[in-house]
Amino acid sequence: MDSRTGELITAPQAENGVFIWEINNPLYFKITEHSQRPFLMNHDIISIQIRFNHNIRKVMGIHKCFLDFRIWTTLQPQTGHFLRVFRYEVLKYLDSLGVISINNVIRAVDHVLYDVLENTINVTETHDIKYKFY
């Protein structure tokens, strides 16, 4: 859903993409929170934010695009190492597809968390997407 207007994002908007080789560093990855074994539970909670950079947003007609993922995992990774592996695997998957779009980034994250990395318990996704009016 577009955060500014409240309208649902259409399928053509979600699938609208850019060839990966046309833009350098198209995505920005950031770990916003890493709770290690909270409340004596046997899993970590890692929050990752993926931001589309200015050049890809300009081509796709997007004002703002943040994808936030909250990951429950039984792995005990170091924060920097997890981010490095996660980023590498997501970009590798997108490179194999050849096109970066909102849906392809979500597919790439799903592939990495459930097929590449082991011990993923649950993932929740929230987003802040705003399309340009003009």
From Swiss-Prot:
Family, per entry: Belongs to the geminiviridae replication enhancer protein family.
Pfam name, any one: Gemini_AL3
Name the UniProt record assigns to this protein: Replication enhancer protein
Role: Increases viral DNA accumulation. Enhances infectivity and symptom expression.
Keyword ATP-binding part of the UniProt annotation: no
InterPro entries, per database record: Gemini_AL3 (IPR000657)
Top-level taxon of the source organism: Viruses
Subunit structure: Homooligomer. Interacts with the replication-associated protein (REP). Interacts with host proliferating cell nuclear antigen (PCNA). Interacts with host retinoblastoma-related protein 1 (RBR1), and may thereby deregulate the host cell cycle. Oligomerization and interaction with PCNA are necessary for optimal replication enhancement.
Keywords per UniProt: Host-virus interaction
GO biological process, one term: viral process
Record bears the keyword Nucleus: no
